[in-house]
């Protein structure tokens, strides 16, 4: 469905056996990536905001939207979590119903057509979250929501693995997970694997930060693995990896409809308009209370 595929993309951490509570966050990432025509950028954003509003008001789908900071320009990524394949149909139906309630059937179809006309290209992927390969992943739903809710940037590396080399690449990630979890300075790393919508085997290795400064002064791969481990890392990369593409994204709250548990972590960021409206009402309330009687009952003109 192009536009209806909302998302909540983020994935590459490192734990050999993920806790049941973390699995409750969903085992799949439903990802929709688009490149927007430069001259259509304003239209794209306006249409997306309409879709956000419809899904928010009528209990449709939830997703996070990210836009490129470093990488191919005018690229946006919409990401949602799914617990299984069946939930994909369920959430798509909820999103369609929300659009029909907000715009009418024909109006919803018109918005989708206009949205498609804004795009240079689009791509859909279903990714399985590899908790067994992820490092320092949160151990409960609240911890996961806090990690996502406080994040403002996502650095993700798409690793294309050569045919026949997936087992050794997975073994390397497990070695990196084990070594990284012993290093108190190593940040969380989330790993996912494309299972629908790709050519060949692709893994996404991702890290989240609350600001650009969070990418400074992190331990290097050599420091985490040690000299022998780093040599093994280089050898397996040379043998198993066809290409690795790194992109830095920032979260776009105005184009997102985050799950409530994520939004409440930083509501001023994820729901800025709602917070501004609440603040405005608070500020104007005293004026109404202090309004003079004359103003409430202005003189009638003949």
Model-derived segments and their meaning:
Residues 6-7, 157:
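Small/flexible residues
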Residues 23-231, 236-302:
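Short S/T/G/P-rich N-terminal loop/turn motif that feeds into the first structured element of a domain
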